[in-house]
Amino acid sequence: TGLSIALVMTLFIIFYVKFAPIYPEYNRNRMLTVTKMKSYPKDNDKSWNCSAVSYDEVKMLQDLPHLEAIGATASNYRENYVEVPDNNEPISVTPLYTDAGFWKVFTFRFLHGKPFTQADIDAKHREVVLPVSVARKLFATDDVVGRRFNMDAQEYRVCGVVEDVSAATPSSVGDMWLPITLNSWVTSDTTGKLVGSVGIYMTAPDAEDKEALKEEVR
């Protein structure tokens, strides 16, 4: 019947969006994610702690033999407010904080400019990549590299503009992307533990290398 066909098509679309290679997550078939970590004393597995992952783990994993790229993301668990020119009402945004490797793991289409660099991240420069819809909302145009705006009373500079990202790709979507070192949850995590506040994303050179990379991570 028509209803059963519609249901099958709906399930197919959901499955496709969740698992197929779609923008900007084209590398799903060779990607590994580490977004949760459970830690406990060697002699007591009942006393455990489960959380996101420490940013220190990026350094621990970056020399694995079957690793092509590794990146990290973090949220600040709250909304930020951007001042819009000629508008008394600020707009709320939810940024995604990333490192330089993020732009190698995920394949964004840059319309203008480029991503922030490792030097920007190390220096905590307030560089930002905007999706085109947010760029137009803030500046009424999309070629805005070098333009500046205020968010939560801090000035930021636009270094790149990308095609919009769908909410169906939660690992990479954001209202804007900022250097991960601007996230206080990440920079305050100096305990040296495996648990922390980031998610880690890795790609193997080929889909055939994914299982080998998984074993190396373990």
Predicted regions and their residues:
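Generic structural signal for small/hydrophobic residues in well-ordered secondary structure
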Residues: T1, K18-A20, L32-K36, L61, ...
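Mid-to-C-terminal secondary-structure elements
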Residues: D99-P115, R126-R218
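A structure-centric signal for secondary-structure junctions around beta-strands
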Residues: R28-M31, P90-S92, K124, E155, ...
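Membrane-proximal extracellular/periplasmic loop immediately following the first transmembrane helix
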Residues: F12-V82, G196-V198
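Conserved SAM-binding loop
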Residues: L7, P95, M202
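Short acidic/polar micro-motifs at solvent-exposed secondary-structure junctions
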Residues: M37-S51, A72-G101, P115-E127, S166
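N-terminal Sec/SRP start-transfer signal
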Residues: T1-V8
